[in-house]
A protein has these predicted regions:
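Phosphate-binding loop of NTP-binding sites
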Residues: 46, 119-254, 260-271
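Structural signal for conserved beta-strand scaffold positions within catalytic alpha/beta enzyme cores
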Residues: 76, 101, 114-115, 139, ...
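Cytosolic catalytic headpiece of P-type ATPases
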Residues: 104-108, 148-149, 219-222, 297-298, ...
Length: 318
């Protein structure tokens, strides 16, 4: 934008615009996808949550004031019947640290963190929490037995270190990211339940969880109305294999009709397969089962070892 330069007693006509043209500078501007922008935006919020003293007592996310705990951060998710914005006063009254919302709200301004989209924030925040965890992660799916197995694994792992377990049956597109939001650096293990009612859901959820160890309990007819056949359900449950960390493990029920089908999928991804079941070829299988009134005594072969267990009368597969 200069038109001249003064040199000693001379005025020299000059155009920096023309100079720049001669340089033939090419600007390569890399466009950031909208998803990446949202992720970066949420990352900034996450960094704020970590650094700000006010957030150090942050204890997970909540989308339901009925189950909200003190120091939770409340997200105003809009559902079919209700909009979370209506419940902001109740959330704060119950002790919510902050409110995450996309709405312009002047009231409670010091407690509001504005985001572009609440659902995206929930998923991206869960992903960031997973990024910052060094825990060994388990993800359990299957047509039946998920919740009871999750609770049993939790009880066992507690003996070896601090363990986080997803509450109740938090296994859907809200429950899984909410569970991940409570994972912290003190946790040595994390146990998560992953459910589905249609194709693609387990893939999306396990992208967030990224388990070291995946478990498929069985393939049954639950949600068969959304699939052509049982093979479709096996494919949907098998989506967990896509997101098991490289070099990880898949635990499969050898007695299930889709054992070999799922095993092949896992081997293609270089995932180690550990089998269990009543079939004697299983890596883990019972040699002797003695059922009593209240307890069951089991003699179990695990590889080359024999283990004797006395358990309550629960599902032997668990």
């Amino acid at each position: 934008h200069e038109t001249e330069q003064i040199y000693k007693d001379k005025i020299i006509a000059f155009s920096d615009k023309e100079v720049v043209k001669k340089l033939k500078i090419t600007l390569k501007i890399k466009k950031i996808s909208s998803k990446k922008k949202i992720y970066l935006e949420n990352k900034k919020i996450f960094e704020k949550l970590k650094k700000d003293k006010k957030f150090r007592k942050f204890k997970g996310l909540s989308i339901d004031t009925r189950t909200l705990k003190k120091k939770n951060v409340f997200i105003t998710i809009k559902g079919k019947n209700n909009d979370g914005v209506k419940f902001i006063p109740e959330a704060l009254k119950k002790g919510a640290s902050f409110i995450i919302t996309s709405k312009n709200i002047k009231k409670f301004e010091n407690k509001i963190i504005k985001v572009k989209n609440e659902n995206n924030f929930l998923n991206n925040f869960a992903s960031l929490k997973r990024d910052n965890s060094n825990a060994k992660i388990f993800a359990i799916t299957g047509s039946a037995g998920k919740t009871s197995l999750k609770n049993l694994i939790h009880e066992l792992l507690k003996n070896f270190g601090e363990t986080y377990c997803s509450p109740k049956s938090y296994n859907n597109h809200f429950g899984v990211p909410l569970s991940l939001s409570s994972l912290n650096k003190n946790h040595k293990y994390g146990v998560f339940e992953v459910g589905m009612s249609k194709k693609g859901e387990i893939n999306n959820l396990t992208k967030l969880v990224r388990p070291h160890i995946g478990i498929i309990t069985n393939i049954g007819e639950a949600h068969i109305e959304n699939f052509k056949n049982l093979r479709g359900i096996a494919d949907a449950k098998g989506e967990i294999i896509n997101n098991i960390i490289s070099g990880g493990t898949l635990i499969l029920n050898r007695d299930d009709n889709y054992f070999n089908y799922l095993k092949k999928k896992a081997i293609k991804r270089n995932i180690k397969v550990v089998s269990y079941g009543k079939d004697k070829r299983s890596y883990v299988h019972p040699i002797q089962i003695s059922k009593g009134k209240d307890k069951t005594k089991l003699k179990v072969k695990v590889g080359n070892q024999i283990i004797i267990l006395s358990i309550k009368n629960i599902n032997i597969y668990n």
